[in-house]
């Protein structure tokens, strides 16, 4: 290796080390040592299931920093509301002495067995594209009226174009009630990316009260929503 190449290599390695050590916060200017990030390990299930009306009880967690216990430095934030069916999150975060932080999240599913407002797993397909086990929530709005977070069953937001939100809204939200035969009575349509591409008058199928399953065809997009169970 010639002298110029050696000098370039030394410069690049030095620059990489500086980026690693100074990329946490501006006050670390001039720091030239390696910093260690906290590691957080969740105990219990993820997702964690709570029945409607039950209190969420923290299953536990541990944290370490360079092999040493760091659990007492973990901060927790949560939006869990066990009085409303849905998918919530508990976020665990910790910051090291250099200002470098790490976080991880536990999903909490609040289930409503036998109810229309519940957490579901979607199976959706159109043509050769087929996606399964996508989490979808139906929330209560008022007496007999519900909001389905995505009439497409996650086909676009989780299946075909994952990671594009929030830049693009691929959740086809609708508010609806059910007719006596279980079919949809669409009351409100959300303003999402492909709204103009679908005919909302062309929805066949619907809800089966005996199985608790939604099975329908939305203008050529087939969706089955099955209540989530462990």
Each predicted region: which residue ranges?
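Solvent-exposed, low-complexity, repeat-rich "mucin-like" stalks and linkers
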Residues: 36-68, 132-134, 153
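Serine/threonine-rich, repeat-prone extracellular segments and beta-strand-based repeat modules
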Residues: 68-106, 110-111
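Extracellular interdomain linker/stem segments of modular secreted and single-pass surface proteins
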Residues: 35-37, 109-118
């Amino acid at each position: 290796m010639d002298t110029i190449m050696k000098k370039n290599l030394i410069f690049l390695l030095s620059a990489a080390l500086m980026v690693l050590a100074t990329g946490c916060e501006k006050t670390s200017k001039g720091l030239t040592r390696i910093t260690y990030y906290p590691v957080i390990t969740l105990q219990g299930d993820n997702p964690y299931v709570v029945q409607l009306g039950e209190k969420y009880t923290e299953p536990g967690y541990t944290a370490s920093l360079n092999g040493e216990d760091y659990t007492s430095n973990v901060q927790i934030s949560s939006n869990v509301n066990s009085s409303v069916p849905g998918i919530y999150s508990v976020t665990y975060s910790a910051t090291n002495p250099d200002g470098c932080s790490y976080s991880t999240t536990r999903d909490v599913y609040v289930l409503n067995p036998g109810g229309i407002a519940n957490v579901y797993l979607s199976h959706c397909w159109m043509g050769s594209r087929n996606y399964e086990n996508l989490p979808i929530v139906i929330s209560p709005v008022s007496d007999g009226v519900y909001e389905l977070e995505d009439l497409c069953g996650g086909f676009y937001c989780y299946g075909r174009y994952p990671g594009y939100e929030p830049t693009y809204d691929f959740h086809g939200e609708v508010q609806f009630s059910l007719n006596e035969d279980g079919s949809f009575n669409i009351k409100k349509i959300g303003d999402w990316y492909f709204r103009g591409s679908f005919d909302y008058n062309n929805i066949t199928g619907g809800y089966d009260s005996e199985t608790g399953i939604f099975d329908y065809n939305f203008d050529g997009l087939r969706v089955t929503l099955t209540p989530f169970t462990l």
